[in-house]
Amino acid sequence: MTQAVMLQGTASDVGKSVLVAGLCRIFYQDGLRTAPFKSQNMALNSGITPDGKEMGRAQIFQAEAAGITPDVRMNPVLLKPTSDRQAQVVLMGKVATNMDAVSYHDYKPRLREQILAVYNSLAQEYDVIVLEGAGSPAEINLRDRDIVNMGMAEMAQCPVILVADIDRGGVFAAIYGTLALLHKQERDRVKGVIINKFRGDVALLYSGIEQIESLTGVPVLGVMPWLDVDLEDEDGVALQNDKYRGNAPRDITIAIVQLPHISNFTDFNALAAQPDVRIRYIRRPEALTDADLVILPGSKNTLSDLAWLRESGMADAVLQTHRQGVPVMGICGGYQMLGDTIVDEVESGLGTQPGLGLLNTITRFAQDKTTTQVNATMSGELPGWLAAAAGLPVRGYEIHMGETVLQEGCCTAMTLQKNGCSVADGAVTADGLAFGTYLHGLFDSDAFTRAVVNGLRARKGLAPWETTFCYAEHKARQFDLLAEAMRQHIDIDKIYTIMQQHQEPV
């Protein structure tokens, strides 16, 4: 008999993903085999499972919180927006097609049977499934074909807890309005409310909580304070909310260009956790002035974002910063942009386009997507700020549709081990001031990260830090801190009771 509970939100970015991770950690600490599940995730932050399947980063870090290996069944449908109207549809970890919103809405009913089968297969292996909704269940225009909120709760026959964000204001209206827009059978499935991201004296909420409970008949299970925990965000909404502006003074400042279609910005969480590093996401040319390193991150639409770089003045600013001796790094789409030429006869149909010209490379887009976890070794000789990283082992994952070929003047940055073969990856110039790679997650390799940060310190005349920061241990501490706070501020016993009362045979 598998127990399950689903967290749905009054809106996007109310904190569902983090609270799901917290519940996964709590149940894991309590000795229960626990798995996260989100039937459909729309995000540009994705990762790769050990068997080469692509899934949302949120479910990956939730699986880590539960102490298990990420499994693509935890996120069977992943939507990766390529424009305001189109998205790449990834089914069970592999690209299926590209669709516009209307076409996908019509397509969703065909996914129900597959989603339910995947969910049931997980339920047969775990004691508890913690499900996550998307956006709000009160999107009445999407209700008839819903597969991720109440539609999924109905398929799983599980109770729902509604999460509301008080930090954005209007929390009681959001709770009341959401419940009012649900059908009665949907409303009956909601067994509790969590008020999230509260700052101040909780006593000020008591009268409001009593009234909302009286009005809705749904109990408030807890009020979570605004937590200073360092955990991954699901999508770019967090970048818009100033979480990553990085105003605290640190020895090293790293500027990451916030591309319109930025993907996998979780690549930089380990960098941001370094005690001597300040990360800043920037969209204005003048914000580059104090950067010790500039990074062009991954992109879901490389040529569109390259055009934005030029139109916004960011391209000129990056090139000027490079001429002043500041290193520039590119990851995946950012690596492609740093090259001389990009040939796209697949994604945009724009043909051959010039890159920024900092690396003498040619990239050709391809139909097939590379998705794999890899171990790699940095090249034995690396110049400049990268020198201390020479020969170091690193680990990461590839998600890209294209191949990049080095021309004269570029050296290979690292060697990947793939299917028993050694494969060259990345490019670096002779002076080390331009460096690119397809490898996501590179900075999760602690020794590499400390080596390159110390290389940046040396450029400023600062002594190296001898202690290597362990990012895996840091993440584990954050999961434990989250679980501790949730036990303190949420009635976890009540959640256990809710799950037991609605326990269903699989």
Swiss-Prot record:
Give any single GO term for biological process. Answer: cobalamin biosynthetic process
The residue ranges of the GATase cobBQ-type domain are 251-448
Keyword Hydrolase applies: no
Any idea which GO molecular function terms this record carries?
A: ABC-type vitamin B12 transporter activity; catalytic activity
What does UniProt list as catalytic? Answer: C332, H440
Q: Which InterPro entries would you find in this protein's record? A: Class_I_gatase-like, CobQ/CobB/MinD/ParA_Nub-bd_dom, CobQ_GATase1, CobQ_N, CobQ_synth, GATase_3, P-loop_NTPase
Which keywords does this Swiss-Prot/TrEMBL entry list?
Cobalamin biosynthesis, Glutamine amidotransferase
Name its pathway.
Answer: Cofactor biosynthesis; adenosylcobalamin biosynthesis; adenosylcobalamin from cob(II)yrinate a,c-diamide: step 3/7
Family annotation (HAMAP family): CobQ (MF_00028)
The entry's family comment says: Belongs to the CobB/CobQ family. CobQ subfamily.
Primary role: Catalyzes amidations at positions B, D, E, and G on adenosylcobyrinic A,C-diamide. NH(2) groups are provided by glutamine, and one molecule of ATP is hydrogenolyzed for each amidation.
Q: How does the record describe its quaternary structure? A: Homodimer.
> Which PANTHER family does the entry mention?
COBYRIC ACID SYNTHASE, DETHIOBIOTIN SYNTHETASE
* Protein name, entry field: Cobyric acid synthase
Q: Which organism is it from?
A: Salmonella typhi
User: What is this organism's lineage?
Assistant: Bacteria, Pseudomonadati, Pseudomonadota, Gammaproteobacteria, Enterobacterales
